[in-house]
Amino acid sequence: MNLINKKNLNIYLCGPTVYSDVHIGNLRTIIIFDAIFECLKNKGFSINFLHNITDIDDKIIEKAQELGISEAELTEKYTNEYFKILEIFNIKKPTKIVKVTEKIEKIIEYIKLLEKKGFTYYNKNNDLVFDILKIPNYGIISGQKIESLLDKNTKKTKSKNDFVLWKKTQKGLFFKSFFGLGRPGWHTECAALIYDYFQKKSLDLHGGGVDLIFPHHENENAQHFALTGNPIAENWFRSGFVNLNGKKMAKSLNNVLLAKDFSHKYNPDIIRSIFLSINPTVPINLTEELIKNHKKLIEKYQKICFEWYFDKKNEKTEKVEQVLNLFIEGKFAKANFLIMELIKQKENSTIRKIFLNLRFNFTKMHLNPESQEKIKNWNKLIMDKNYSEADKIRKELWKIFKNS
């Protein structure tokens, strides 16, 4: 990521479509962001992070009708569930979270600007559509060739990938607009929110999964370029797929591990450890064996934070900086190699500082002030070579630490 000479970072990450519970794979990007943002703050960066909630969508309408409740009831439930998940997995809330339905007027204004500039037309369903052929660099985000996107049935005057800005419909939740009754398209929702919140500026960083590169990120960029002549983001951060037992994790395939179910069964720090151990774009195959290995690793990390109380050497600031920089650059495997080297060298203060910046929940574990007296007693017993009594105190303190 090229963040040179930037101290105030404008960042966006697409949020969930709130018609069901999020699965563990949905959390990969935001957990990585949570850790990287803390690393950036450690270097003096200020983070302005916008995260959206898609609370109007065909899937939402279908689910609400199936359950016999309103879209608002359904989305309120799953939005609150999502916020609970963020808390459980120790993910800091973004600077600003915005629901699409709260910004319909802004989205309509945004679409009007695109129409006024001549980037739109009405399709056979009377939906207002964006004409991608009006964007000379369409495909720059995804590497698509514009020639391959042409629709052979329209004599090369239209593209099969022209996308809906405003869908004309009265099914489910819909809104009044200059384009008729309907609701906005997904690609436009995100682009309009970015344009509004960041005052037409390009983002310093846009995040999302690799599955969103085309068409979602490409279409966001096309709209922003149409209105400003600039890309929607100067840097992109994308995370790879999370598979479950060798198969794609997807609700449509009924092959998911819900985040809430993971947290009921395992320590949430385990998934943070997994996500931060593998370079971001590399696919992860989540298995019981992988979870078990990282469970052992978290226990090891907890012990290191406990050992720090007995040997508070000065942290090596340059080593902390080196590791955090590697995480910022997305070189997770190399960063973890250096952490293992520091563990071998018993640099507990340095390692603990790194873990604090990666926002592992276990860093909140502590020994209370009353325990400090026991540590003094332990030191005295060690000096007196009364190792059996010292060991008893250490075991007592470990219990206090684990339960803190």
From Swiss-Prot:
A Gene Ontology cellular component where this protein is annotated is: cytosol
Map motif 'HIGH' region onto the chain.
Answer: 16-26
Q: Specify the taxonomic lineage.
A: Bacteria, Bacillati, Mycoplasmatota, Mycoplasmoidales, Metamycoplasmataceae
**Residues involved in ATP binding:** 251
The places in or outside the cell where this protein is found are:
Cytoplasm
In its UniProt entry, the species of origin is given as Mesomycoplasma hyopneumoniae (strain 232)
Where does this chain carry the motif 'KMSKS' region?
248-252
This chain belongs to which protein, by name? Cysteine--tRNA ligase
Which SUPFAM superfamilies does UniProt cross-reference here? Answer: Nucleotidylyl transferase
Which residues does Zn(2+) bind? 14, 190, 216, 220
